[in-house]
Amino acid sequence: MRSITYTLLVGMLACTCISQAEMRDWKDKQGRKIQAELVSCDGTTVSLKLRSGKTVPLPITKLCDEDQSFLNEQSSDIDSDNGDTGAGQLTPPNFAQPWPESIKTDENFEVKTIKEGPDQFIYESPHFKYISDAKLGLQLIRAMGRMFEATYDINKSLPIANKPTRDPQVKFPIFLFEKKSDYIAAGGPPDAAGVQITKGNDPTEPYGHVLVPFESLGVQKVGSGYRMDRAKDFHTLIHEVTHQLMGREVKQASWFTEGTAEYVGMTPYSNGRFALSNNRSSIVASVTAYGKGKENKGRALGKDINLPYSLEEFMNMDYASFTGNDGNTNYGIAPLLIYYFYHGDGTGDAAQIKAYIKALQKGTPEVEAQQLLLNKRTWAQLDDAISKFWRRAGITLKFAKKQVSQNE
């Protein structure tokens, strides 16, 4: 069932684009009134400007049903210039928002039981549906859901307009397995902590689903119930959930798809909080050594990295080659490129990669969209810029020179 909160969110975000705000009465669920005009909404809080000129914040869930309906009626078409279709279906893109320094998810989010037994147990948090083959308490679902909801929040907050996080009607399915053998039987890789699976154009799962064994969440059976190790390293699961939160139209290139997931997965996370302000050191540690976590999950490429392919070849590598014999290396190089385009290219405002993402969202082919990343540079010049950037962080990154055939 589509919740009124989601409907309100779409309406309010769309209302921020209205050219003329009007002074009107606003009422909360307790019947208290203020007269104000709508200023903006960040997705959780609406800003209202009082007659005095003071702007006050109000949680969107506190508004009365009448005001929620009013806001929904005010919703306008999503800006088609950003590649979105379906008026009112997606919240507006957030490309203009500042890069977040940290993300802390609300610990008081609602969890509820949808179905219990006999062989399937379904629970929900605000943005995820958990389908488990064993009964779990709501307290455990809340503890476990904190990581999933925080991953949703960071992907929504990155100013790259992740389309699935802007879809107010979706709950992302997470399948939980008490036994690792059942996880494998359902399609989970034996050596992976979890996996995201997309089933073609299945309308019931527009963004696929994630398979996770209990052990990857640090969930252990204790007596007749379960408990969770909150100190567990969730890098792989955060990586896979990030895949689920990326629109299909941007998943054309292996380097971008995997690099984006690794960028989020390598960002320091603890108890519902992502620290982005110092994630460069964490990414460097995860790529060059074994990371900063206690489980030693890093690529261990060292700080002198010589690659057998050119930058252009790497950024156009098919998925089979990307995950093949040099997979560990490729998974390490991809987040270095992502970090450069997010924070090191040009003035550090991510302008070129945002243009690239916008182009992909409009259906532009990958090779054509890459011209926006090049930004009138040759591949050699871009290679040099990336190498110089990482040299300042103590990493020597050397791509091979592209081999030009005699027929070219």
Please tell me what each predicted stretch does.
Residues P118-A253, P365-A369:
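Juxtacatalytic substrate-recognition/specificity segment
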Residues R51, F177-S181, H343-D345:
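Short, flexible beta-strand-to-coil junctions
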Residues M1-T5:
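Positively charged n-region of N-terminal signal peptides that target proteins for export
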Residues I18-E124, K129, Q139-R142, R146-A150, ...:
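Compositionally biased alpha-helical segments
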Residues V46, R248, Y269:
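Basic nucleic-acid-binding interfaces
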Residues Y6-T16:
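Bacterial N-terminal signal peptides
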Residues M23, Q35-L38, C64, Q68, ...:
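Extracytoplasmic/secreted envelope proteins and their assembly/folding machinery
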Residues Q196-V212, K232, K251-E408:
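Acidic/His/Gly-enriched intrinsically disordered linker/tail segments
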